[in-house]
Amino acid sequence: GVDVPVVKQGSGPPVLVLHGGDGPLDRLPFAESLSGSFELMHPTHPGFGGTSIPEHFDNLQDLIFLYLDLIDSLDLKGPILMGFSMGGWLAAELAVISAGRFSKLVLVDSVGIKPGGPFDRDVADVFALPAEELLNAAWHDRSQAPDFAKMTDDELQTVAANRVAHGLYTWEPYMHNPKLRYRLHRIDIPTLLVWGENDGI
Protein backbone atom coordinates (compact mmCIF):
# COMPACT_ATOMS: atom_id res chain seq x y z
CA GLY A 1 0.00 0.00 0.00
CA VAL A 2 0.86 3.68 -0.23
CA ASP A 3 0.81 5.84 2.90
CA VAL A 4 -1.21 9.04 2.39
CA PRO A 5 -0.98 11.73 5.09
CA VAL A 6 -4.43 13.13 5.90
CA VAL A 7 -4.92 16.34 7.90
CA LYS A 8 -8.35 16.58 9.55
CA GLN A 9 -9.85 19.97 10.31
CA GLY A 10 -13.14 20.99 11.94
CA SER A 11 -16.26 18.96 12.64
CA GLY A 12 -19.50 18.19 10.83
CA PRO A 13 -20.35 16.42 7.57
CA PRO A 14 -17.18 15.03 5.96
CA VAL A 15 -15.54 16.81 3.02
CA LEU A 16 -12.64 15.22 1.15
CA VAL A 17 -10.49 18.09 -0.20
CA LEU A 18 -8.14 17.26 -3.09
CA HIS A 19 -5.42 19.84 -3.63
CA GLY A 20 -3.85 21.08 -6.85
CA GLY A 21 -0.27 21.65 -7.89
CA ASP A 22 0.57 23.97 -5.00
CA GLY A 23 0.04 21.26 -2.40
CA PRO A 24 -2.27 20.92 0.63
CA LEU A 25 -4.81 23.68 1.29
CA ASP A 26 -5.54 23.34 5.01
CA ARG A 27 -3.87 26.66 5.90
CA LEU A 28 -5.84 28.81 3.47
CA PRO A 29 -8.70 31.04 4.72
CA PHE A 30 -11.44 29.08 2.93
CA ALA A 31 -10.48 25.95 4.87
CA GLU A 32 -10.57 27.74 8.21
CA SER A 33 -14.01 29.12 7.34
CA LEU A 34 -15.48 25.79 6.18
CA SER A 35 -14.06 23.93 9.17
CA GLY A 36 -16.62 25.70 11.36
CA SER A 37 -19.39 23.64 9.74
CA PHE A 38 -17.65 20.62 8.17
CA GLU A 39 -14.96 18.07 8.90
CA LEU A 40 -12.39 18.68 6.18
CA MET A 41 -9.99 15.91 5.27
CA HIS A 42 -6.90 17.06 3.37
CA PRO A 43 -4.90 14.15 1.93
CA THR A 44 -1.49 14.91 0.41
CA HIS A 45 -0.93 13.40 -3.03
CA PRO A 46 2.25 11.28 -3.21
CA GLY A 47 5.18 13.49 -4.19
CA PHE A 48 3.77 16.63 -2.58
CA GLY A 49 4.62 18.12 0.80
CA GLY A 50 7.83 16.14 1.16
CA THR A 51 6.23 12.74 0.51
CA SER A 52 7.66 10.21 -1.93
CA ILE A 53 6.23 9.02 -5.23
CA PRO A 54 5.81 5.24 -5.54
CA GLU A 55 7.96 3.76 -8.31
CA HIS A 56 4.93 2.49 -10.22
CA PHE A 57 3.15 5.88 -10.31
CA ASP A 58 3.35 7.73 -13.62
CA ASN A 59 0.03 9.51 -14.25
CA LEU A 60 -3.21 10.72 -12.70
CA GLN A 61 -4.87 7.31 -13.03
CA ASP A 62 -2.61 6.06 -10.25
CA LEU A 63 -4.05 8.75 -7.96
CA ILE A 64 -7.61 7.83 -8.92
CA PHE A 65 -7.23 4.25 -7.71
CA LEU A 66 -5.18 5.31 -4.68
CA TYR A 67 -8.04 7.55 -3.54
CA LEU A 68 -10.70 4.92 -4.14
CA ASP A 69 -8.72 2.74 -1.73
CA LEU A 70 -8.25 5.65 0.71
CA ILE A 71 -11.99 6.36 0.81
CA ASP A 72 -12.58 2.70 1.65
CA SER A 73 -9.92 2.70 4.36
CA LEU A 74 -11.29 5.88 5.98
CA ASP A 75 -14.78 4.30 5.89
CA LEU A 76 -16.26 7.55 4.61
CA LYS A 77 -20.03 7.49 4.16
CA GLY A 78 -21.29 9.90 1.51
CA PRO A 79 -18.63 12.59 1.86
CA ILE A 80 -18.69 15.78 -0.15
CA LEU A 81 -15.89 15.61 -2.71
CA MET A 82 -14.09 18.91 -3.37
CA GLY A 83 -11.17 19.41 -5.75
CA PHE A 84 -9.02 22.36 -6.75
CA SER A 85 -7.30 22.65 -10.14
CA MET A 86 -5.55 19.29 -10.66
CA GLY A 87 -7.48 18.05 -7.63
CA GLY A 88 -10.68 19.05 -9.44
CA TRP A 89 -9.67 16.86 -12.36
CA LEU A 90 -9.00 14.02 -9.93
CA ALA A 91 -12.36 14.61 -8.21
CA ALA A 92 -14.22 14.53 -11.54
CA GLU A 93 -12.53 11.25 -12.48
CA LEU A 94 -13.47 9.74 -9.11
CA ALA A 95 -17.08 10.88 -9.48
CA VAL A 96 -17.30 9.45 -13.00
CA ILE A 97 -16.11 6.06 -11.77
CA SER A 98 -18.00 5.95 -8.49
CA ALA A 99 -20.44 8.84 -7.99
CA GLY A 100 -22.46 6.75 -5.54
CA ARG A 101 -19.69 7.05 -2.97
CA PHE A 102 -20.19 10.82 -2.67
CA SER A 103 -23.09 13.07 -1.67
CA LYS A 104 -21.98 16.17 -3.60
CA LEU A 105 -19.18 17.31 -5.89
CA VAL A 106 -17.43 20.71 -5.86
CA LEU A 107 -14.91 21.57 -8.59
CA VAL A 108 -12.89 24.76 -8.08
CA ASP A 109 -10.89 26.15 -11.03
CA SER A 110 -10.66 22.59 -12.26
CA VAL A 111 -8.54 21.35 -15.13
CA GLY A 112 -9.02 17.94 -16.72
CA ILE A 113 -11.36 18.81 -19.58
CA LYS A 114 -10.08 20.50 -22.73
CA PRO A 115 -12.89 22.46 -24.42
CA GLY A 116 -10.81 23.56 -27.42
CA GLY A 117 -9.14 21.69 -30.24
CA PRO A 118 -5.83 19.82 -30.05
CA PHE A 119 -3.80 22.94 -30.88
CA ASP A 120 -5.76 25.41 -28.71
CA ARG A 121 -3.97 26.52 -25.56
CA ASP A 122 -6.80 26.24 -23.05
CA VAL A 123 -4.54 26.09 -19.99
CA ALA A 124 -1.41 28.16 -19.37
CA ASP A 125 1.89 26.27 -19.40
CA VAL A 126 2.53 26.47 -15.67
CA PHE A 127 5.87 24.72 -16.07
CA ALA A 128 7.25 27.30 -18.51
CA LEU A 129 5.98 30.53 -16.92
CA PRO A 130 8.51 32.53 -14.87
CA ALA A 131 7.74 32.42 -11.14
CA GLU A 132 6.34 35.97 -10.95
CA GLU A 133 4.06 35.47 -13.95
CA LEU A 134 2.82 32.20 -12.53
CA LEU A 135 2.00 33.78 -9.17
CA ASN A 136 0.17 36.65 -10.88
CA ALA A 137 -1.83 34.19 -12.97
CA ALA A 138 -2.68 31.88 -10.08
CA TRP A 139 -3.38 34.37 -7.28
CA HIS A 140 -5.84 37.26 -7.52
CA ASP A 141 -4.80 38.31 -3.99
CA ARG A 142 -1.02 38.12 -3.98
CA SER A 143 -0.98 38.55 -0.20
CA GLN A 144 -2.20 34.93 0.01
CA ALA A 145 0.44 33.64 -2.40
CA PRO A 146 3.66 31.98 -1.25
CA ASP A 147 6.64 34.31 -0.90
CA PHE A 148 9.60 32.38 -2.28
CA ALA A 149 12.07 35.02 -1.09
CA LYS A 150 11.16 34.28 2.54
CA MET A 151 11.27 30.49 2.27
CA THR A 152 13.93 28.31 3.83
CA ASP A 153 16.00 25.98 1.67
CA ASP A 154 13.89 23.04 2.87
CA GLU A 155 10.67 24.84 1.93
CA LEU A 156 12.04 25.67 -1.52
CA GLN A 157 13.01 22.02 -2.00
CA THR A 158 9.42 21.05 -1.19
CA VAL A 159 8.12 23.57 -3.75
CA ALA A 160 10.46 22.10 -6.37
CA ALA A 161 9.41 18.54 -5.51
CA ASN A 162 5.74 19.58 -5.73
CA ARG A 163 6.36 20.83 -9.27
CA VAL A 164 7.97 17.52 -10.23
CA ALA A 165 4.96 15.59 -8.90
CA HIS A 166 2.54 18.01 -10.56
CA GLY A 167 4.28 17.43 -13.89
CA LEU A 168 4.21 13.66 -13.46
CA TYR A 169 0.45 13.63 -12.96
CA THR A 170 -0.57 16.27 -15.52
CA TRP A 171 1.98 16.47 -18.33
CA GLU A 172 0.88 13.90 -20.92
CA PRO A 173 -1.67 14.76 -22.14
CA TYR A 174 -1.24 18.22 -20.68
CA MET A 175 -3.74 18.99 -17.89
CA HIS A 176 -6.59 16.89 -19.28
CA ASN A 177 -7.99 13.50 -20.12
CA PRO A 178 -9.39 13.64 -23.68
CA LYS A 179 -12.02 11.02 -22.81
CA LEU A 180 -13.28 12.62 -19.59
CA ARG A 181 -15.73 15.01 -21.26
CA TYR A 182 -17.56 12.02 -22.77
CA ARG A 183 -17.95 10.37 -19.36
CA LEU A 184 -19.25 13.29 -17.31
CA HIS A 185 -22.87 12.18 -17.84
CA ARG A 186 -22.18 9.45 -15.29
CA ILE A 187 -22.00 12.06 -12.51
CA ASP A 188 -25.53 12.09 -11.05
CA ILE A 189 -24.94 13.92 -7.76
CA PRO A 190 -25.39 17.66 -7.08
CA THR A 191 -22.34 19.41 -8.53
CA LEU A 192 -21.04 22.94 -8.01
CA LEU A 193 -18.56 24.46 -10.45
CA VAL A 194 -16.55 27.40 -9.08
CA TRP A 195 -14.35 29.52 -11.31
CA GLY A 196 -12.67 32.83 -10.52
CA GLU A 197 -12.95 35.37 -13.33
CA ASN A 198 -9.37 36.45 -12.58
CA ASP A 199 -7.99 32.93 -12.81
CA GLY A 200 -5.10 33.25 -15.25
CA ILE A 201 -4.33 29.55 -15.50
Model-predicted segments: where are they?
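Acidic catalytic loop of the alpha/beta-hydrolase fold
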Residues: 24, 197-201
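Active-site loop/oxyanion-hole signature of alpha/beta-hydrolase fold enzymes
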Residues: 41-82
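Conserved catalytic-core motifs of eukaryotic protein kinase domains, centered on the activation segment
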Residues: 27-28, 51-57, 116-119
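Hydrophobic, aromatic-rich cap/lid helix
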Residues: 153-182
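Flexible "cap/lid" loop of the alpha/beta hydrolase fold
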Residues: 89-97, 102-135
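Short beta-strand/loop motif that positions the catalytic acidic residue
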Residues: 187, 193-195
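Conserved HGGG/HGGXW glycine-rich cap/lid loop of the alpha/beta-hydrolase fold
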Residues: 2-52
